[in-house]
């Protein structure tokens, strides 16, 4: 306490603790982790909470192909805070981490690892390399998660490559197929030419690309309904005008689609006539920079043009004019270029016209085939320019402009993708969409906008393409009749494949011939033959992870279906949240989760996306090295994670300062609990001073706020409540006011303060335990224990509000006392500025009060009131006087205290020298020293 050495320093009860001011988390945390591993903390915790109600947070499996990043850290720490809190709130909350282990990224890594040999290795060999790669990264990522303080069954995670998982996935597929939800058909799907596979909607990301927006005219060749003749328009000089931004699809054009509800006009340019929607004539002419044109005759309903024919612009074939409701007046010409092999709307409308073929002149790698004529061999992106140049030269292009637009890209390789009609396996969403809507309504969505978002996505989505033309994944369990080619899936074949996979894993599909897998006696339903081949596709990885409700929740004895919560980032509305919902509703008729909690993206300090190329990223390993994992955990808790969360070195530096204030509050209390035995030294409530009761009431308010925050997963509320309690209520007020009692006395007053502080620290440490898992345990290790307290703080129950609650009258009284204290501090500052006093203990304060305020202040003993103001003397005077204040009925005057300064407590007193043996001490300090 004293800056200069005094002979009485040793008689003071100065704080003493081995709990360090400098956290040293980067070094301490690994030591704690080893202790947790050595003592099997997770399984101990589960055993400790055995028999309690369960809370199941089901882990969405991260992809096992690299180091974790800040987004992964955010996700896992949110989950861990929830798990730790629930285990302290009267639940048994197991956490089984999972890993998504199949899919293209791992397959590509495996292929790159073998170099030139990739053409020579078998599918089975490739799969074995993939499995080794995935397994290695599971170990790496598990260690990184544990370094963040994440507690869970990392010794027994669920893996989508495990035989028992794959077997259950096959059964889910079979259940859906039995209900008629699985079918194979030709449809346009997202196709990545670089990865050479179909993609699901969840595997698409949008980016800005350049393209040519062009208006192209197609010459009318046949008018079977005599529409042109009826309106006096010469057929040999008449064209339909279409608009497109995908020039490479023109070789696949087989139709031009009009809307039967729209009217179309003949637009004369020179001596030629051009058909387009009447409402779009001006916008088309403006886009084509054509000023001299004339609309000839009256508008014609779109229906009159149906089944007219036209010549293809660049290939020796004719197309059909057809009608479709998807044609709009929002852009273009009202005449839509239709290539059924390269667009969903195009494909669907062509299905209504059997005479219109579905042409796909593009191969797996994105190269045009012989169906594209002279463009064969060109990749679609290069063909854009070649085709445009030829059409421009032939006069088919009416207008052209270079634009930037949002275009779909593959989320794996980040290259542009195409729509391409291929034979694929689909899940028919339309057949159970209404059931999905009902399931969505049963779920609690957090934030609540998740309900409408999910419902909108399900409403707008097409059938789910679940097949992939790759090797590393769970095979589609279908057989084909060698004689007629019909696919064959029955209960018996599903059971045979499932049993085989459960025994040997899905590699068995590649080890055995079809006849060795399919049950004896199976015959083709169409032709009666019994010779078979196997399907060569694998399932979409979203079907893998979407099956965890069956393969994990239903299979693991410590878990149950449905889960209480799924918690992931917002991108999972079209990913895991949705695939899990679809497979669960399709197979079980209900949602796999009771609630869904969603978090945002991690962005840099300016709110921009993090990219390696931009150099604006920050890695968890860097922050752990500099500050420790608890600072990352504090970052998570301090953020509103329902929106995008900012991260950067400056932010973590600021958080380390906030952390230090929380830590130092605990350290101060621990220092003042030196020698305190809560089993024998705690005093009864009636021995507490009134300010002690105020501190406990403030603690009770903290419990109310933090309990409310944890209940709705608002950890930001918990953090701010804890921070304000530590800084404002404790450090700036209560702990400051009680220093004299703690340092200078040894009696009941000191024990009352210690009792209060002990209760505060025990509760505070439990409150912060889910967030600051390392620091809370360190505090717990240094804390004096009572009988029955556990070795680990996470085994404790979260403190319940109400035990220290104060009534409104008490709260109002202390709000008034604190307001008076604030006014006194202002006057003391003025006295200090005028050199009347130095430290506040040099002051004597006179408080001029009205009757009401006098009565309130006089209810506090004067020595306690002086401690409250941190002055040597306080005098109460009824009436007016002193400096006016913001408190009604209060005036404040400050003067230098009379008497002399006590060498031990620094208070001014007239009793200095009253004890001959201690002439420099006040009477109180002399009696303490002599005791």
Report each predicted region and the residues it spans:
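Residues immediately within or flanking Cys/His clusters that coordinate Zn2+
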Residues: 189, 407, 478, 521, ...
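Residue patterns forming the tRNA-binding/recognition surfaces of aminoacyl-tRNA synthetases
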Residues: 2-25, 31, 35-39, 111-251, ...
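Alpha-helical recognition segments enriched in aromatics with Gly/Pro capping
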Residues: 222, 319, 353-366, 470-472, ...
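Cys/His-coordinated zinc-binding microdomains
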Residues: 196, 469, 485, 528-529, ...
């Amino acid at each position: 306490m004293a800056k200069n050495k005094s002979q009485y320093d040793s008689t003071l009860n100065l704080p003493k603790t081995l709990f360090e001011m400098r956290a040293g988390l980067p070094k301490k945390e690994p030591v704690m982790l080893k202790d947790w591993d050595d003592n099997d903390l997770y399984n101990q915790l589960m055993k400790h909470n055995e028999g309690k109600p369960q809370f199941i947070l089901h882990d969405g499996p991260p992809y096992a192909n690299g180091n974790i990043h800040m987004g992964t850290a955010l996700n896992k720490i949110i989950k861990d805070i929830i798990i730790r809190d629930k285990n302290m709130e009267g639940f048994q909350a197991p956490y089984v981490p999972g890993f998504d282990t199949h899919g293209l990224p791992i397959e590509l890594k495996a292929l790159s690892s073998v170099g030139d040999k990739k053409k020579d290795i078998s599918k089975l060999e490739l799969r074995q390399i993939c499995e080794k790669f995935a397994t290695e990264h599971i170990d790496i990522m598990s260690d990184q998660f544990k370094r963040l303080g994440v507690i869970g069954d990392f010794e027994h995670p669920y893996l989508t490559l495990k035989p028992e998982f794959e077997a259950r996935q096959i059964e889910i597929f079979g259940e859906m197929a039995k209900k008629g939800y699985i079918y194979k058909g030709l449809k346009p799907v997202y196709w990545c030419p670089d990865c050479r596979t179909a993609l699901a909607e969840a595997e698409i990301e949008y980016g800005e690309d350049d393209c040519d927006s062009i208006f192209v005219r197609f010459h009318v060749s046949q008018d079977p309904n005599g529409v042109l003749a009826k309106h006096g328009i010469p057929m040999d000089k008449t064209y339909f005008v279409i608009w497109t931004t995908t020039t490479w699809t023109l070789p696949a054009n087989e139709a031009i689609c009009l809307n039967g509800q729209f009217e179309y006009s003949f637009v004369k340019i020179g001596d030629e006539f051009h058909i387009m929607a009447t409402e779009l004539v001006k916008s088309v002419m403006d886009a084509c920079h054509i000023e001299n044109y004339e609309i000839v005759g009256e508008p014609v309903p779109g229906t009159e043009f149906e089944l007219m024919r036209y010549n293809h612009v660049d290939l020796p074939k004719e197309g059909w004019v057809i009608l479709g409701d998807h044609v709009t007046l929002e852009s273009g010409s009202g005449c839509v270029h239709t290539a059924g092999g390269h667009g969903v709307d195009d494909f669907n409308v062509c299905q209504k016209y059997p005479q219109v073929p579905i042409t796909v002149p593009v191969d797996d790698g994105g190269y045009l085939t012989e169906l594209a004529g002279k463009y064969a061999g060109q990749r679609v992106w290069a063909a854009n320019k070649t085709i445009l140049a030829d059409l421009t030269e032939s006069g088919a292009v009416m207008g052209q402009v270079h634009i930037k637009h949002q275009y779909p890209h593959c989320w794996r390789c980040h290259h542009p993708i195409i729509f391409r009609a291929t034979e694929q396996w689909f899940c028919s969403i339309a057949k159970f969409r209404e059931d999905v809507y009902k399931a969505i309504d049963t779920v609690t969505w957090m934030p609540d906008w998740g309900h409408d978002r999910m419902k909108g996505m399900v409403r707008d989505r097409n059938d789910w393409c679940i097949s992939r033309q790759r090797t590393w994944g769970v095979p589609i369990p279908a057989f084909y009749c060698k004689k007629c080619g019909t696919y064959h899936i029955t209960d018996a074949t599903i059971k045979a494949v499932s049993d085989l996979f459960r025994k040997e894993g899905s590699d068995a599909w590649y080890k055995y011939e079809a006849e060795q897998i399919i049950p004896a006696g199976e015959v083709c339903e169409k032709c009666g033959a019994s010779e078979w081949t196997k399907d060569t596709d694998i399932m979409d990885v979203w079907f893998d992870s979407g099956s965890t409700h069956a393969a994990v929740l239903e299979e693991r004895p410590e878990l149950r279906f449905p889960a209480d919560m799924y918690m992931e980032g917002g991108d999972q509305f079209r990913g895991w949240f949705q695939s899990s919902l679809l497979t669960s509703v399709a197979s079980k008729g209900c949602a796999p989760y009771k609630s869904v909690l969603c978090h945002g993206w991690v962005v840099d300090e300016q709110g921009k996306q993090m990219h390696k190329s931009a150099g604006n990223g920050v890695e968890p390993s860097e922050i752990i090295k500099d500050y420790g994992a608890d600072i990352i955990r504090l970052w998570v808790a301090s953020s509103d994670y329902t929106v995008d969360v900012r991260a950067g070195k400056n932010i973590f530096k600021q958080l380390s300062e906030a952390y230090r204030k929380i830590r130092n509050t605990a350290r101060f209390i621990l220092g003042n609990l030196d020698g305190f035995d809560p089993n024998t030294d705690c005093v009864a409530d009636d021995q507490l001073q009134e300010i002690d009761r105020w501190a406990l009431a403030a603690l009770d308010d903290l419990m109310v706020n933090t309990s409310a925050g944890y209940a709705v997963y608002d950890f930001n509320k918990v953090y701010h409540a804890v921070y304000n309690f530590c800084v404002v209520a404790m450090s700036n007020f209560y702990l400051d006011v009680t220093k004299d009692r703690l340092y200078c006395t040894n009696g009941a007053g000191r024990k009352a303060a210690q009792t209060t502080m002990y209760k505060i620290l025990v509760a505070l440490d439990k409150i912060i335990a889910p967030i600051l898992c390392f620091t809370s345990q360190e505090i717990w290790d240094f804390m004096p224990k009572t009988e029955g307290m556990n070795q680990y703080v996470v085994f404790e129950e979260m403190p319940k509000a109400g035990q220290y609650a104060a009534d409104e009258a008490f709260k109002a009284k202390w709000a008034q006392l604190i307001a008076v204290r604030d006014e006194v501090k202002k006057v003391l500052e003025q006295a200090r500025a005028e050199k009347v006093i130095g430290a506040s203990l040099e002051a004597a304060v006179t408080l001029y009060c009205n009757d009401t305020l006098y009565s309130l202040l006089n209810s506090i003993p004067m020595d306690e009131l002086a401690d409250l103001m941190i002055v040597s003397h306080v005098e109460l005077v009824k009436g007016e006087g002193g400096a006016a204040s913001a408190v009604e009925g209060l005036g404040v005057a400050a003067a230098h205290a009379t008497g002399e300064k006590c060498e031990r407590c620094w208070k001014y007193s007239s009793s200095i020298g009253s004890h001959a043996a201690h002439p420099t001490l006040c009477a109180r300090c002399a009696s303490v020293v002599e005791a």
